[in-house]
Swiss-Prot record:
A Pfam family the protein falls into: SeqA
MF term (GO), any: DNA binding
HAMAP family in alphabetical order: SeqA
Known function: Negative regulator of replication initiation, which contributes to regulation of DNA replication and ensures that replication initiation occurs exactly once per chromosome per cell cycle. Binds to pairs of hemimethylated GATC sequences in the oriC region, thus preventing assembly of replication proteins and re-initiation at newly replicated origins. Repression is relieved when the region becomes fully methylated.
Family: Belongs to the SeqA family.
Taxonomic lineage from the root: Bacteria, Pseudomonadati, Pseudomonadota, Gammaproteobacteria, Alteromonadales
Subunit record text: Homodimer. Polymerizes to form helical filaments.
Main location: cytoplasm
Name of the gene encoding the protein in the UniProt record: seqA
SUPFAM superfamilies hit by this protein: Replication modulator SeqA, C-terminal DNA-binding domain, Ribbon-helix-helix
Sorted UniProt keywords: Cytoplasm, DNA replication inhibitor, DNA-binding
Biological process annotations from GO: negative regulation of DNA-templated DNA replication initiation; regulation of DNA-templated transcription
Source organism: Pseudoalteromonas translucida (strain TAC 125)
Protein name according to UniProt: Negative modulator of initiation of replication
Amino acid sequence: MKQIDIDDELYQYIASNTQSIGESASTILRRLLNLSGEKIQTANVELNQNNQTTTTLPKVPPVAEQTPALAAKPSAVAEKSVQQKNANVFNVLNKEELAMQKGVVGRFLFILSAFYRTHKTDFRAVLDIKGRDRVYFATSKEDLVNSGSSMNPKNITDSEYWVMTNSNTTRKKMMLHEVALCLGYSTEQAEKIRDYL
């Protein structure tokens, strides 16, 4: 195994270029450096106590062992490049930043903010997401407060939208799932987003 130490600034740059949660440092660097995928390796990146990162690369298997895996990659690569052309919340969400959010409400607002940044023009569709007796989203704090009691409205960061946060985690997950679906994500993607909470 090989290890490299990188400074905090470089680590932040690599992390900010993450396109999907769980993407390896090796994959990100290959994309940034425009390297071909002939010798794809995954890296394990660990943050040490002094905020220095250590990257561990596994041994490269012989070329004969790589061939079957590489034969299966082209369709996945083509599919991924098609997705990258479209606005995608997975390009904006950063796992490290998500983990730093304070509690469930913090993560909830962070994910909604990522949806807003990705889909500013279509985000208005979330206003149609409602409960049986409750309004979940509004364009003003007053609209939420007037729609029911105990709403605890919070502003979705950098947007004119407000969301009701006085609900349990299961309800918040359902709301994220509905937001993803109304913005055009597949059921599988919506479930993945829901599980980030």
